[in-house]
Regions:
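Hydrophobic structural segments
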Residues: 72-74, 121-123, 129-131, 209, ...
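N-terminal glycine-rich "phosphate-gripper" loop used for MgATP/nucleotide binding
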Residues: 82-91, 96, 112
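ATP/NTP phosphate-donor binding region
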Residues: 1-77
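Conserved beta-alpha junction segments in alpha/beta enzyme cores
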Residues: 26-34, 186-233
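Internal helical hairpin/lid segments
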Residues: 214-261
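Short, acidic/small-residue loops that bind anionic groups at enzyme active sites
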Residues: 97-125, 129-136
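Conserved anion/nucleotide-ligand pocket segment
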Residues: 131-207
């Protein structure tokens, strides 16, 4: 596996939009708090040329998105790459990625949701460790959920070893709206099979993950710790149930299975 160098103070983080753009979520002004937070944490924030603007599906063209990815990996000053948000179409970029360029310039890259396709493809084709974590706009959360997220994000990208403990609370609301009233619930994990394991993790958003099935970008699930999350907006537990069945048919002997939302 290729493990990118840990982030240090004053390192540059490049923001890109492989799926939806900043214009889908209010533009630069509405997300200024995210940039301010990264700056306060000691990092330099720069943006790809195509993080704004969009077509009917909320993205920019394939060639523009590919250009931002390749430019970020090529730039020696960039030490980490973070996606704006998720979306629906990062998988259409995969045939056009220069995986040799990425492998020769390993960097930290982080995002969530639709980023699953990009993250797993990069790892499958290059061996580069990728990070399933906060997207750029989630950094504007200033409440206790934001504090937990920020701490985990910084630990993952700056430390070689750290202990990740579950958040004490969770919410399912419109966190991205500044005037949204948030309701937090106590975290209640349910353990079906207890034990201790170590190994490599693979996974992400389960809906997006299976866009890779049968392609050269499908991850190797065998003997892995599988992490899966499922968005609860507009879909049911029945949808998740059949996707989970497919996971278990692809991975005959996973080391562990962790489920989230």
């Amino acid at each position: 596996m290729l493990i990118p160098a840990r982030l240090k103070q004053n390192d540059e983080i490049r923001i890109i939009a492989p799926s939806r753009t900043l214009d889908c979520v209010g533009g630069f002004a509405a997300n200024q708090t995210a940039q301010e937070k990264l700056t306060q944490l000691g990092f330099k924030v720069t943006f790809g040329n195509y993080v704004s603007g969009m077509t009917l599906d909320g993205t920019n063209s394939i060639s523009e998105r590919i250009d931002d990815i390749h430019t970020a990996f090529s730039d020696p000053n960039v030490k980490a790459i973070q996606t704006v948000i998720g979306g629906f179409t990062s998988n259409e970029l995969l045939p056009y990625l220069d995986f040799d360029l990425i492998a020769n310039n390993p960097k930290n890259i982080c995002g969530f949701s639709d980023f699953t396709a990009l993250a797993n493809a990069i790892t499958a084709k290059t061996g580069l460790v990728t990070y399933y974590g906060p997207a750029y706009i989630t950094l504007k959360m200033l409440d206790k959920a934001g504090a937990y997220q920020d701490n985990a994000f910084i630990q993952a990208l700056t430390q070689k070893h750290y202990e990740l403990r579950p958040s004490q609370t969770w919410s399912s609301d419109e966190w991205f709206l500044s005037d949204s009233k948030r309701t937090f619930y106590p975290t209640a994990w349910k353990v079906y099979t207890s034990g201790r394991v170590h190994g490599q993790t693979v996974g992400g958003n389960v809906n997006t993950l299976f866009l890779l099935a049968g392609t050269p970008y499908q991850p190797d699930f065998e003997d892995k710790i599988i992490l899966l999350e499922f968005a609860d907006d507009g879909e049911t537990w029945l949808d998740f149930s059949r996707l989970l069945a497919q996971v278990l048919q692809l991975a005959k002997r996973p080391r562990a299975l962790l489920l989230g939302r």
